[in-house]
Design a protein with these regions (language model features):
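Conserved acidic segment of CheY-like receiver
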Residues: 9-20, 25-29
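Active-site residues of response regulator receiver
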Residues: 62, 92
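Short, glycine/charged-rich "phosphate-handling" switch motifs in NTP-dependent
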Residues: 109
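C-terminal output helix
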Residues: 116-126
């Protein structure tokens, strides 16, 4: 799903299997409306397909997904050198330090917890996007 289409904009890939969480993330990105183009993949497999077709400036990825989870996706994208220099931020409900550490080892540059509080999530995600993308 492409939210907008403009070649001059920064391009973000959101990888999220749950429609509610994907919409939650898109709402948090509304602050950047007009300066970003957002594609959504429903799992790691779909994300890899999109990564072969288009360059992204930032990737926001859930860890727990069907077909191919975030960890497996990171392993394959780095192995195939897909978007290997693109900042990848993990968005997850997991509080496990082991998940955070493994994500870092696989190349994630940041880790944002998806809380049920939209304002808190929005604030954390917006700050992280600004930090890594300069929008």
């Amino acid at each position: 799903m492409t939210r907008t289409d403009n070649a001059a904009k920064k391009v973000i890939l959101v990888v999220e299997d749950l429609p509610f969480d994907a919409e939650f993330t898109l709402q948090a990105l509304e602050k950047f409306e007009g300066s970003v183009d957002v594609d959504v993949a429903r799992d790691g497999w779909d994300a890899l397909v999109l990564m072969k077709q288009r360059h992204f400036d930032l990737i926001l990825m859930d860890l727990k997904m069907p077909r191919m989870d975030g960890f497996e996706t990171m392993i394959l994208m780095r192995g195939y050198q897909l978007q290997h220099e693109v900042p990848l931020i993990i968005l997850t409900n997991s509080d496990l330090e082991a998940d955070r550490e493994r994500a870092r080892q696989l190349g994630a540059v940041d880790y944002v917890h998806k809380s049920g509080d939209l304002a808190r999530f929005r604030s954390a995600l917006q700050a992280t996007v600004e930090k890594h993308m300069r929008v």
